[in-house]
Amino acid sequence: MNILHSTLSTWRDRLAPVSRTSTFRTTGQITPEEFVLAGDYLVYKFPTWSWADASSPAKRVSYLPPGKQFLVTRGVPCHRRLNENFAGDAGHEDEIVRDMLSGADADDDDGWLRTGGGRDLAEKQAERIKDVRTVDESGNMGEQEDDEEDIPDMEDDDDDEEAIIREPAGKSTTQPTRTYNLYITYSNFYRTPRLYLSGYLSPSEPLPPHLMMEDIVGDYKDKTVTLEDFPWFDGGVKMASVHPCRHASVMKTLLDRADAALKIRRDKLKQAHSADQANRINSERGLEGLVDETRGLSLNEQQGHAAGGDEWEVLQHDEEDQVAIRVDQYLVVFLKFIASVTPGIEHDFTMGV
């Protein structure tokens, strides 16, 4: 049954009409050209990622150029298997990340599970959110602010140590380390990226496909992640794949939240009375308006600095229609939210170069 599903999925992608019209801002979907643009940005910013070709010309898809059929990063560590500490515990169920514009009665299928860490992690995250405050010019701490506050610079995030998720002290494990090769392909049917994972017990010993499910969170094993042949390789190489049916709606949610947060920042900058006050606004790192997986992302497009000028002057002249996340930054955000499916795999390792 799984073989039939994999075959049908492959042919559906290859036979679906190719969209050349950008609907990135309105639907969260991207065209093949935008996928290549986003892939080029990912490879440029994070050299652990690279473009790759299909194993043979017959395996290529016509809507992507030769040599840029998919993206790959190799040897990503996974130090621990997932258990109840990741999948949640009694009294603390996994949350659904909903579209910010939909009501409380929205169908759960319209959202994305926010998982990992159980009650303890959730409480710690809540405490961190409560600690976010503003400070006035006199140094007085203000009241807690509403969600969707400020967005950090994307260009400044590359060297931000706080953006890297690290193993908490005292939480070491004796479980054998696995490594994964991660592949990002383009789903022509859903018009979104799609992630495939191939695991290894050692550099020369592939991980049996069914054991990859030990590194997948809870309900995803049945609802979202399946074992399928990788369409770009000959020989039927079985991998775990995160189904893309909800990717567009989740990305649209993140885009909307980031834009709303950027608008709040821009409004605060307009009300700033000095460059120092503007710099304090820009230095704030609250990201409550986005899902936790996007913490530390660079979500603000920079226009560049005039000679002798500072960021205050540049941001004062931003266009009102400026967006928080450009289409070429799509895959960076995509990887941040997709990490919720496999929190044991150190996705940030791929962004540490």
Curated annotation (Swiss-Prot):
- Keywords in alphabetical order: Autophagy, Cytoplasm, Protein transport, Transport, Ubl conjugation pathway
InterPro entries associated with the record: Atg3/Atg10
Which Pfam families would you find in this protein's record? Autophagy_act_C
A GO MF annotation of the entry reads: Atg8-family conjugating enzyme activity
UniProt region (Disordered), positions on chain: 107-156
User: For the region Flexible region, what residue ranges are annotated?
Assistant: 85-174
Acidic residues: bias regions: 143-156
Quaternary data: Monomer. Interacts with atg8 through an intermediate thioester bond through the C-terminal Gly of atg8. Also interacts with the 40 amino acid C-terminal region of the E1-like atg7 enzyme. Also interacts with the atg12-atg5 conjugate.
Query: What's the stated role of this polypeptide?
Result: E2 conjugating enzyme required for the cytoplasm to vacuole transport (Cvt) and autophagy. Required for selective autophagic degradation of the nucleus (nucleophagy) as well as for mitophagy which contributes to regulate mitochondrial quantity and quality by eliminating the mitochondria to a basal level to fulfill cellular energy requirements and preventing excess ROS production. Responsible for the E2-like covalent binding of phosphatidylethanolamine to the C-terminal Gly of atg8.
Among PANTHER family, the record links this protein to: UBIQUITIN-LIKE-CONJUGATING ENZYME ATG3
Q: What is known of its domains?
A: The flexible region (FR) is required for atg7-binding.
Supply the name of the protein: Autophagy-related protein 3
Q: Which organism is it from?
A: Aspergillus fumigatus (strain ATCC MYA-4609 / CBS 101355 / FGSC A1100 / Af293) (Neosartorya fumigata)
Record lineage: Eukaryota, Fungi, Dikarya, Ascomycota, Pezizomycotina
The record's gene field reads atg3
